[in-house]
Curated annotation (Swiss-Prot):
Keywords: Cytoplasm, Magnesium, Metal-binding, Nucleotidyltransferase, RNA-binding, Transferase. It is an enzyme of class 2 (transferase). It comes from the Bacteria. HAMAP family: PNPase. Its cofactor is Mg(2+). Belongs to the polyribonucleotide nucleotidyltransferase family. The gene is pnp. Residues 692-753 are annotated as: Disordered. Mg(2+) binds at residues 488, 494. Its EC number is 2.7.7.8. SMART domains: KH, S1. This is Polyribonucleotide nucleotidyltransferase. InterPro entries: ExoRNase_PH_dom1 (IPR001247), ExoRNase_PH_dom2 (IPR015847), ExoRNase_PH_dom2_sf (IPR036345), KH_dom (IPR004087), KH_dom_type_1 (IPR004088), KH_dom_type_1_sf (IPR036612), NA-bd_OB-fold (IPR012340), PNPase (IPR012162).
Length: 753
């Protein structure tokens, strides 16, 4: 009898077969589920502490997605030969899992929860992120931890006008959309997508389609829980101290209402801090014992109630705007003199200084991913230092939030980049957030587009982004355009849309509540389009099109095409030829497998010289053409002459002069520059030259009766000895000079010596 109480559930999901297992692996975790989707295998585990830490005022959820290189049959390439810090993909996938599950934990549940997901086997055609989402949902559901799930998830493609469920890597190459949606049976909670300028109705249809398909996974998880679920925790939310809440409200309500009439963020924040301090001082004066953390939570609830009620009542928002107005926009291009391209984009109290840098092909990022190696020629990096929000903080390694915001901006802009053939540069865009009061990632999209156009990148269209918010109470709701930071914290949805005048290029949605209907999403998309068009108009006013010339400080790229079979000639033995080319011309040369050569130089003359020398190296010798070159070697039967770099031809002794040549050295010396004519080439590429073909035969000179060795007539080979007819021995010939026979003369000469 097995020691395991293993439970397995299998279901068909579109073109894939999905298997979920629990009870065999990681049994000491609160919950553990192994999910297999066509050989992509993911293990998700969840562990929660039984008690919350004292004074804890937030939900400490940690999600770690880890890819094991053995999953793809690889050994890590690092010095220590083991997995190191998380890759960008691992960080993004961790965020992708965190976002839909976080709002499903009950309010007041502050116990530590740690979710760890390992990819232990990978089919390159099946992405592990969807399997990881389903495995996490199943592990939480069977664990008994307080969790209002499960959730389902699906990837949606758009190919030939139809939605495709969970397209593989190959299919996605033909897809106009890559969208991931996650949610419960009743509501969508998270959307992450990029698209090729698709209209709003197509994007909304993809969200609805993916949500419906995700319910298939939810049904299977319910079945797994019925058979293998652990008892649900006997957890009850801490009782609210109604008496303390009333006292806090009496002391702080009026002061906070007054604070939220202040339009300036810093002044408003300072007023709120003073209100918080006054409430605590008032409670102390009344002799009330209180927990400072709990009191601050109560004051935050009062802030949320004030802001939300004002908006739903149709009153002006925090900064005085209505629900559809975009904050004032200021744009300045070329703000940094020696960068390749730059833009300062300011929208209200959110500001991004965005800089673009152009590089060569070797500047592209080479990524050794689990599914295979690839190069990325478009890099987008987002940085937000503490001073952007007027705070004191530590500067350290890149945070998960910065990686996520950078990837969203990159997705938004990628659809409008020129092809590699049109613009062979590697592009790096860096967004430095210098002020932040909401929607800094969308400011990065706008600034990134403008800075690339300032750098001379021929963008297909202007790209703008806008962040939308939502306030919902019962059946009343208000969609907010261009949300502030406070509206993001106090609202129910963060909905970011980026695109062009033609359609959407990126969409990200995080919903904190259930009950967001298709109709609400339609309103949000329509309102976002209106705002996007307004911002695009401002951007087009500031910069109508990309600069015709790239910066004088950027490397100039010149491309040429050669026969792929000639690549080895350009590289040379051990790289000697290309190394000499780059050193002597002061250029950078990259060679593609298809024979495309890219020459990078800030000096056009140097690039032209490199191009000329490459053309010489790769040129084909033409029959009948006259070449000038040095004699590289003297042979007994002729000489070798260099025609082109790396290409010599044979000048036979019979082709040196019209008269008979006894010694080649009498006519030619090594290093001598001569002109020769190409007479023919054979199938092996050997070239035959002629020097005498360039001069006329002197008058009166007759052709030699005896042909030169290379020009003698072809003779049939002699028959084998056993096949020859018997012949009588011939009589010795008389010497031509009438002397002794040759043999006798030779013997006498040897005796004399």
């Amino acid at each position: 009898m097995s020691i395991f109480n293993k439970v397995t559930k299998t279901f068909q999901w579109g073109q894939h077969t999905v298997t979920m297992e629990t009870g065999e692996i990681a049994r000491q975790a609160s919950g553990a589920v192994l999910v297999n989707i066509d050989d992509t295998v993911v293990l998700a585990t969840v562990v929660a502490s039984k008690q919350a830490k004292s004074g804890q005022d937030f939900f400490p959820l940690t999600v770690d997605y880890i890819e094991k290189t053995y999953a793809a049959g690889k050994i890590p390439g690092s010095f220590f030969k083991r997995e190191a810090k998380p890759s960008e993909l691992e960080t993004l996938t961790s965020r992708l899992i965190d976002r839909p599950i976080r709002p499903l934990f009950p309010e007041g549940f502050y116990n530590d929860v740690h979710v760890v997901i390992h990819t232990v086997s990978l089919n390159p055609e099946v992405d592990a992120d969807i399997a990881a989402l389903i495995a996490t949902s199943a592990a939480l559901s069977v664990s008994g931890i307080p969790f209002n799930g499960p959730i389902g998830a699906a990837r949606v493609g758009f190919i030939n006008g139809e939605y495709v469920l969970n397209p593989g890597q190959t299919q996605r190459k033909d897809s106009q959309m890559d969208l991931v949606v996650a949610g419960t049976e009743a509501a969508v909670l998270m959307v992450e997508s990029e698209a090729q300028q698709l209209p709003e109705d197509v994007m909304l249809g993809a969200v609805v389609f993916g949500h419906e398909q995700g319910r298939i996974a939810i049904d299977a998880i319910h079945e797994l829980v019925r058979e293998a679920g652990k008892p649900v925790w006997d957890w009850v939310a801490p009782a609210k101290d109604e008496e303390l809440i009333a006292k806090v409200a009496a002391l702080g309500d009026e002061a906070l209402r007054t604070a939220y009439q202040i339009r300036n963020k810093q002044s408003r924040t300072q007023a709120c801090r003073e209100a918080y301090a006054a409430v605590k001082a008032g409670l102390t004066a009344q002799g009330v014992e209180f927990d400072g953390v709990k009191v601050e939570g109560m004051l935050f609830d009062i802030e949320a109630r004030i802001v939300r009620s004002q908006i739903l009542a149709g009153e002006p928002r925090i900064d005085g705007r209505d629900t559809r107005t975009v904050r004032p926009i200021e744009i300045r291009n070329s703000v940094l003199p020696r960068t390749h391209g730059s833009a300062l984009f300011t929208r209200g109290e959110t500001q991004a200084l965005v800089v673009s840098t152009l590089g060569t092909e070797r500047d592209a990022q080479r990524i050794d991913a689990l599914a295979g190696e690839f190069e990325d020629r478009f890099l987008f990096h987002y940085n937000m230092p503490p001073f952007a929000t007027g705070e004191v903080g530590r500067m350290g390694s890149t945070k998960r939030r910065e990686i996520g915001h950078g990837r969203l901006a990159k997705r938004a802009l990628a659809a409008c980049l020129p092809s590699k053939e049109e613009f062979p540069y590697t592009i790096r865009v860096v967004s430095e957030i210098t002020e932040s009061n909401g929607s800094s990632s969308m400011a990065s999209v706008c600034g990134g587009c403008l800075s690339m156009m300032d750098a001379g990148v021929p963008m297909k269209a202007h790209v703008a982004g806008i962040a939308m918010g939502l306030i919902k109470e019962d059946n009343r709701f208000a969609v907010l355009t261009d949300i502030l930071g406070d509206e993001d914290h106090l609202g129910d949805m963060d909905f970011k849309v980026a695109g062009t005048t033609s359609g959407i290029t990126a969409l990200q949605m995080d919903i904190k509540i259930q009950g967001i209907t298709k109709e609400i999403m339609q309103v949000a998309l329509a309102q976002a389009k209106e705002a996007r068009m307004h911002i695009l108009g401002k951007m087009q006013e500031a910069m109508g099109e990309a600069k015709a010339e790239i910066s004088s400080f950027a490397p100039k790229l010149y491309t040429m095409k050669i026969n792929p079979e000639k690549i080895r000639d350009v590289i040379g033995k051990g790289g000697s030829t290309i190394r000499a080319l780059t050193e002597e011309t002061g250029t950078q040369i990259d060679i593609g497998e298809d024979g495309t050569i890219t020459i990078a130089s800030s000096d056009a003359a140097k690039a032209d010289e490199a191009k000329r020398r490459i053309e010489e190296i790769t040129a084909e010798v033409e029959i009948g053409k006259i070449y000038e070159g040095p004699v590289t070697k003297i042979l007994d039967f002729g000489a070798l002459v260099n025609l082109l770099p790396g290409k010599d031809g044979l000048l036979h002794i019979s082709q040196i002069a019209h008269e008979r040549v006894e010694r080649v050295a009498d006519y030619l010396q090594e290093g001598q520059i001569i002109k020769v004519k190409v007479m023919e080439t054979d199938e092996k590429g050997r070239v035959k030259l002629s020097l005498k073909a360039l001069t006329e035969r002197p008058a009166g000179m007759e052709r030699s009766d005896r042909p030169a060795p290379a020009e003698r007539e072809f003779r049939q080979p002699r028959e084998p000895r056993q096949q020859r007819e018997f012949r009588e021995p011939r009589e010795p010939r008389e010497p031509r000079d009438g002397g002794r026979p040759a043999a006798e003369g030779e013997q006498q000469q040897q005796q004399q010596q």
